[in-house]
Amino acid sequence: DFEETMEFVERSQIDAVAPAIGTAHGIYHGVPKINFELVEKLGKEKTPVVIHGGSGLSAETFTRLIELGGRKVNISTLVKNAYLDKTKELVLSGEKFAPIPFDTEVENAVKEEVKKHPEVFSGKRTSF
């Protein structure tokens, strides 16, 4: 609710607000129903809007949320999954790795995943 959120912002004097807009932490089971109208209303206010639970959202959804006023996006689950997926791949490969090369492989996989997002968040890329 816009009025309730703004009352909270004003009373708490927070620096940024992460409203309940239909996103969720973790992995989505189905397509989330995003309250774009609330993001748009809050995006016109001076307090920056934070999008929590960004992992799994489409590039189109990110673009729309940012255009409407989203100023910070959290994608922690996505980063953690890149880490876990590469770790699992390397362990199951049966190949023997020394710790440093193993860590480097995992780190590079995470970097590659993370690199995709600034382009989407800035509007230079329309898909992952």
Predicted regions and their residues:
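Alpha/beta enzyme core
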Residues: D1-E45, A59, T63-L68, N81, ...
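Short C-terminal domain-edge/linker segments immediately following a structured domain
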Residues: T47-V50, K80-A82, T104-E107
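Glycine- and other small-residue-rich loops at beta-strand/loop junctions that grip anionic moieties
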Residues: Y28-V31, I51-G54, S76, V106
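Extended, intrinsically disordered, low-complexity segments
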Residues: E89-F128
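Hydrophobic faces of well-ordered beta-strands that scaffold small-molecule active sites
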Residues: V17-P19, V49-G53, R71-I75
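A hydrophobic, small-residue-rich beta->alpha segment in the mid-to-C-terminal subdomain
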Residues: I66-K96
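Generic, low-specificity signal for short hydrophobic/alpha-helical stretches with a mild N-terminal bias
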Residues: I21-A24, T47, G69, E95-P99, ...
